[in-house]
Amino acid sequence: ANTNWNLVSSPVIGQDIDTFVAIEDLSSVSGSNIGLRDYNNSVASWEYYENGVSVAGDFISGDGRGIQLADPGDISFSGSINTSDVTIGMTSNTNGFNLVGNPYPSYVAGNEKADGTNNILSINAANLIENTLWFWNQETNSYLPINQSSSAFHIAPAQGFFVNALGSENLNITEAMQSHQETDSFLRLTSRREIQLTLTNGSDTRNADIYYIEGATTGWDNGYDSSIFGGI
């Protein structure tokens, strides 16, 4: 990882949080805050871990966190491989956004082009306000939305992302979603006709991708249209 913020999730079971903090070269953010943070959707903001403050317990499978290293390097997790389906409890609170992640040391299918049946969006459609996954894109300094109109998207091991919960529902990530891939998590695997509109103010960039899909409407098609991430 570089020294930018990354969204991650433990790909193993049993990684102690205090041990992780002691071993990893986490950045100093401000005051006693360090480069490890949780997202709290009750107040729509980040909550930071503090230097020297012990946190009991392990990382929970499927929970996402923000991590920033002091220097570029690898992020390591130690534990046992998850060999069962993972159920992640979500809350709606202020805005419904939940930071979750891939709980396996293998890629998982994000949308139906990655796997027609066993993918996160299809399996969890009834539990999400918007059938979209949001990933932090360091190149554009913005969140990249992935939906059913996106190209085949396989979520990398330890990758964190946001979803928007309908209520106190569960997000289900199953063993059947796993696959072996040799590409990174942001590589588009297919090509097709599309229009991309780009807006920039000199520091931030926003893209709007327009696809031609048979059967789509000129209105809002949940699962095929996505809004800009509004969690922060």
Where do the protein language model's features map onto the residues?
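Compositionally biased Ser/Thr/Gly- and acidic/asparagine-rich
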Residues: 2-15, 19-22, 30-232
